[in-house]
């Protein structure tokens, strides 16, 4: 499990009196704000998820992403085509799989926050969707599942009923060009495509608020979210 925590981070930064600024949809992360990010993700949200899994009869172990993910500074292109300096935001370049495989061998669920260690030893804030995709590339599971607060990839963002149930990888670029895949969905879908190219059979986008959505998506013919696959 790789989790996020954007809203909790924004609340914590506001409480600390630290301005939250976004460039091209990415949170600009300063040395002061990355301390809050790591605190919220790795020492508040992460133990909470681990605790809930354990309470429900599962076995889970928490990891700060700094123990698992390696990264380089991420510099998205601005409107003029120039790289934007958004501070301590990382692009995951490597995954330390040893502790994850050790957990899996013991039927323990690893729960990882989306932070990473840079080449400079600094803590970086990372996109959770991209981090999850890179974990899948490294571990090669059969399935990768993205759970969020939307029903799946929507043909019309304003219509929750317009879920695209199946999307072949070859059709992704056309949907980007048509504006169907936009904003925060772009890194999510790009990560899914990267995972499929690396050997993951299927990637699912499902609504985590909906009871049994994971079981219904994987084990029923109709499904309830979006499935991305090679064909």
Language-model segments: which ranges?
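Nucleotide/pyrophosphate-binding catalytic subdomain
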Residues: 1-209, 216, 220-222, 229-231
């Amino acid at each position: 499990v790789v989790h996020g925590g954007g809203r909790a981070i924004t609340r914590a930064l506001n409480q600390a009196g630290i301005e939250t600024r976004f460039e091209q949809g990415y949170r600009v992360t300063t040395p002061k704000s990355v301390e809050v990010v790591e605190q919220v993700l790795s020492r508040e949200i992460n133990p909470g998820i681990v605790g809930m899994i354990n309470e429900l009869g599962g076995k889970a172990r928490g990891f700060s992403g700094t123990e698992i993910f390696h990264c380089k500074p991420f510099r998205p292109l601005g409107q003029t085509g120039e790289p934007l300096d958004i501070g301590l935001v990382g692009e995951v370049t490597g995954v330390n799989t040893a502790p994850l495989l050790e957990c899996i061998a013991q039927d323990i669920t690893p729960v990882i926050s989306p932070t990473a260690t840079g080449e400079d030893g600094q803590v970086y804030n990372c996109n959770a969707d991209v981090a999850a995709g890179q974990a899948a590339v490294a571990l090669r599971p059969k399935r990768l599942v993205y759970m969020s607060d939307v029903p799946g990839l929507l043909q019309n963002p304003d219509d929750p009923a317009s879920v695209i149930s199946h999307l072949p990888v070859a059709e992704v670029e056309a949907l980007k060009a048509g504006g169907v895949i936009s904003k925060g969905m772009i890194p999510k879908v790009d990560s899914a495509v990267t995972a499929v190219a690396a050997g993951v059979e299927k990637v699912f986008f499902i609504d985590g608020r909906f009871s049994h959505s994971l079981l219904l998506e994987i084990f029923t013919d109709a499904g309830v979210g979006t499935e991305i696959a090679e064909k």
